[in-house]
Each structure stands twice: as structure tokens, then as C-alpha cells.
């Protein structure tokens, strides 16, 4: 069976550095940090008092307020990015076979705010007997965003959620890619969203010592590959990619951002939350993706790394890149856009895939910000080009995006410049 080619025809993003793809791209190219004091709740007693929050989000631009009240914030973000991406793709839904359009859209955590709020209300009022919101369960569960998107458009194709912590939305893109190239769908709305900047989310990650505590200068806290890094910054938002079978896209005259070349998946099988110190899973997932794409490592121009600004993770990923790419590792560009967006958890892969695609489209690699002279880690080879502090112009024909999740889940997707 000949596999079908898959292209990207629409993009949508809600992020801490911009609502909508154009604003997101402009800000990451210019090295703008989305970090600041937490406003979603009073974090004054928490070890970490800052995050990368979405700003000025108005859900009524996407759905009416009555419907929004039935959704957790993470689902509202999902609806917003899906609507932007579908509109961007130019799909005329009324002319499409809706049985051939699917939605694969995930969340690493899901409706934690809804859960926290409802359980809190129960303990506050428990002497009155149990009383829960009738939308408690559908607001909370991590599959509901995919369901809501399909209901909104009437898409009857493959529909489910992925959940693999921070690898979630890359896995969603990978599944969408595989289903389309196997002929199971013409179009799939893929991606992920997250909204976990609430007491349980921040407190839980603080308890694991995963978050930066640089409260005096939040905008400088995410500093991947720098010696003084002390953990990641929580982010929120969503990203959506419209994946489409090539001939279907051409038949309707769609613009094509890039082609999906290959995907990889692997497991560290090492620790609940820490990366394998030698980058075993990271190495394997990149090799798997390159093999799937039938691509020589020397063809890769840019790697959007997982790069969370954690002590172990950054070292292991840099080691893995050197092992997989050999001498070519010193020729390509590497950057962590998490230095600006923070870590969007289950939405990270989709948002970083968008950054990778736009690097191909525009010939610009966004930077890894916040590296300072002398702040070098003896365990990291700085002959690698981490694109520190300033975007770099270069031709990008192939971009690879890594995402690694708690539990040892690793996912990788490779995009390439579209050519007939």
C-alpha cells in the first residue's frame, strides 16, 4: 500500500506571548517573554509566584458566554485555536465529506481548575450534602476538547484525545499524520490545549521542585541550557494544526505551510518525572522520526528542542542531539521557544510545531532567550548553536520538534518545506 502524503494547511495558537498565530510568531522572533506574576489566583504563599499566562483572552470572540460556562478554560482555549486553524485552512465545511474529517486533540492534565473548584465547593458545603455542577465531569475530562470541536463543526471522522503529559499534542499530530497517510481521513484537526495555572497545578509542580523560583525576575527565569537554570515556568494556551492529505489539499486550492515528513515515539523507561540522564529516549525518538521520514540527519536544519530549563533535561537532550547528528549537530540551529512561552504542558508540542513550521516558511529561527555571558554549564557543549538571545536568519528546509513528558513519553515530528 502506498502511503499518502500529508501537509499542514491551517494553524491556530493561543499563547502567553500572543493570541493568534501572527502575534505569537512576531513575539517569539523578537525574543519577548510571556512571564509575569500570577493573576489567576493569589500565589503569595507559593514558592513560585509567577507563570506564563495567556493575556486578554476573550472567549466570546469564539463562542457565546452561555456555552463557555459549560467548558473548563482548557477547552475554551481548544475551541479558540481550532476555529483559527480551520478558518486559516480555508476549509469550506459545507462542501466537505464530514465523515472524512476527524479531530485528535489532547490535554496533558485537562480540567484541573474545574476539579479544584468543585471539590473545594464540596468540602466547604459538605454539611449540606453533596452538590456538584451538572457539567463537572464533562468540563473536567481530558477528552472533551476533541469532542467539543467535532460537535461544533459536525466532523464525524476519527475523534479522540491523546494524553502523554508534555508529549500529548505531538502524539496527537503523529496520530493524525498516520491516520491520513493510511487513508483513514482526508483532514484531521490536531493539537492540544492546557490551563493548569491554578493552586493545585502550581502547588503540585512546586512540591516536585520542578518549577523555577526566580520570583524577582520572572521574565528571565526560563533559561534553557544556562548553568543557572532552576526549573521550568508553567505556561498555558493551545495550538492547532490542520493536517490534510496532499491531493485533497491541492484539489481545493489550499495554501500549504509545510509537509509532515515523519514522526517518532519512544519511552525512557527510567523515572516517573526525570529524563534519562544519557538521553536514551530522546536519542531513540529522533532516530525513529528520521527513519520514518527516510531522511539523513544531515538534512535537518533546525531543532525546536524540548528544552524546559531543568537541570537534568537540558543536558540529556543536548547529549542526544550530538549522538544522533554527529558533526552535523554543530551545523544546525537549536532553540527552545519555552524560554519565551514557558511550558504549555500538553499544548507544548502543537505550539512548538507551529514555531517549527513558521521557521521553514519565513527562513528565521526563533531564539533561546536569557543566556548570559559566563553562565555556561560544564556539562553542555556550547559549540552547538543554541540560537542564544537573538533570532537567526537561515534557510530552513527541514525542522524537527521534540517533546518529552513525565512517565518517559517521548515524541518527535519532522516537517519539511513542501515541494511537488
Could you say what each language-model-derived stretch is?
Residues 39, 184-230, 263-277, 307-314, ...:
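Acyl-CoA/ACP chain-elongation machinery
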Amino acid at each position: 500500500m502506498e502511503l499518502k502524503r500529508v501537509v499542514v494547511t491551517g494553524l491556530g495558537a493561543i499563547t502567553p506571548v500572543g493570541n493568534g498565530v501572527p502575534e505569537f510568531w512576531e513575539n517569539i522572533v523578537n525574543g519577548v517573554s510571556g512571564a509575569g506574576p500570577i493573576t489567576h489566583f493569589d500565589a503569595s504563599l507559593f514558592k513560585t509566584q509567577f507563570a506564563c499566562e495567556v493575556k486578554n483572552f476573550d472567549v466570546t470572540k469564539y463562542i457565546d458566554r452561555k456555552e463557555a460556562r459549560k467548558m473548563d478554560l482548557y477547552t475554551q482555549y481548544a475551541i479558540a485555536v481550532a476555529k483559527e486553524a480551520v478558518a486559516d485552512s480555508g476549509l469550506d465545511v459545507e462542501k466537505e465529506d464530514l465523515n472524512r474529517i476527524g479531530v485528535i486533540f489532547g490535554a496533558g492534565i485537562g480540567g484541573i481548575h474545574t476539579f479544584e473548584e468543585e471539590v473545594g465547593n464540596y468540602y466547604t458545603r459538605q454539611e449540606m450534602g453533596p452538590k456538584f455542577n451538572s457539567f463537572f465531569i464533562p468540563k473536567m475530562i481530558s477528552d472533551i476538547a476533541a469532542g467539543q470541536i467535532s460537535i461544533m463543526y459536525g466532523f464525524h471522522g476519527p475523534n479522540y484525545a491523546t494524553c502523554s503529559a508534555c508529549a500529548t499534542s505531538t502524539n496527537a499530530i503523529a496520530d493524525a499524520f498516520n491516520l491520513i497517510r493510511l487513508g483513514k481521513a482526508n483532514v484531521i484537526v490536531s493539537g492540544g490545549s492546557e490551563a493548569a495555572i491554578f493552586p493545585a497545578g502550581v502547588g503540585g509542580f512546586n512540591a516536585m521542585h520542578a518549577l523555577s523560583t526566580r520570583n524577582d525576575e520572572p521574565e528571565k527565569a526560563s533559561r534553557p541550557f544556562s548553568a543557572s537554570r532552576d526549573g521550568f515556568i508553567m505556561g498555558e494556551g493551545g495550538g492547532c494544526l490542520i493536517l490534510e492529505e496532499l491531493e485533497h489539499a491541492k484539489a481545493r486550492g489550499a495554501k500549504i505551510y509545510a509537509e509532515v515528513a515523519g514522526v517518532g515515539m519512544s519511552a525512557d523507561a527510567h523515572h516517573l518525572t526525570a529524563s534519562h540522564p544519557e538521553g536514551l529516549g530522546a536519542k531513540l525518538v529522533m532516530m525513529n522520526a528520521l527513519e520514518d521520514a527516510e531522511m539523513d540527519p544531515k538534512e535537518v536544519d533546525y531543532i525546536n528542542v524540548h528544552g524546559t530549563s531543568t537541570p537534568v533535561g537540558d543536558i540529556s537532550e543536548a547529549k542526544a542531539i550530538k549522538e544522533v547528528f554527529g558533526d552535523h549537530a554543530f551545523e544546525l540551529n537549536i532553540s527552545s521557544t519555552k524560554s519565551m512561552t514557558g511550558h504549555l504542558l500538553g499544548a507544548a508540542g502543537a505550539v512548538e510545531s507551529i514555531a517549527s513550521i513558521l521557521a521553514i516558511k519565513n527562513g528565521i529561527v526563533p531564539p533561546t532567550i536569557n543566556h548570559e555571558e559566563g553562565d555556561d554549564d560544564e556539562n553542555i557543549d556550547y559549540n552547538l548553536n543554541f540560537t542564544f538571545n537573538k533570532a537567526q536568519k537561515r534557510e530552513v528546509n527541514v525542522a524537527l520538534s521534540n517533546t518529552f513528558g513525565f512517565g518517559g513519553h517521548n515524541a518527535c515530528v519532522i516537517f519539511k518545506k513542501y515541494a511537488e
